[in-house]
Amino acid sequence: MFDVRCFPKSAAMLLAFHKPFGVVSQFTPDGSRHRTLADFGFPTRVYPIGRLDAESEGLLLLSDEADLNARLLHPARGHVRTYWAQVERVPAAEALAQLERGVKIGGRMTLPCSAWLLDPQPVMPPRVPPIRFRKNVPDAWIALELVEGKNHQVRKMTAAVGHPTLRLVRVKVGALELGDLAPGKWRGLSAAERASVFTR
């Protein structure tokens, strides 16, 4: 486990966590059956930067620095969030173009983004529990790069173009990557990774 004593007392603590499926992005129970961040041995003074819903997986950042939420997640900062979404059926070029132009969700258009079919298709760690496959319906992994992150936005976007999301993994926030960090594990960020946050 990462030794938090490596952080000088004056330095912000910044951690990367591979949030598994079925974990809520908070330390206190929410009344559901889901596990919380308290189950993973984090230092006592950190809190999540942004959120991933319980059904989503991947990179979740935690810190003891209060202003990092705005520094990392406000659209004006331009820190792109990259998601890999496993969707029903293989999207055609027009569906991907629709995602890039923006789709209407709840009466408003999403901001332009980048969307593409992953080639080759990634081999991801198994999800527990596994997703439900429809026997005669193919699936595919696509990537989306967004600078905004409304509630369930990626799932709503892919559903709006006819490709419901089966599994969603956030793989990158700005220059910070999930990499090969295993589900349920966390680590402190390197000096170079921290610089990519604090110098922007």
List each model region and its residues.
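RNA pseudouridine synthases
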Residues: 2-200
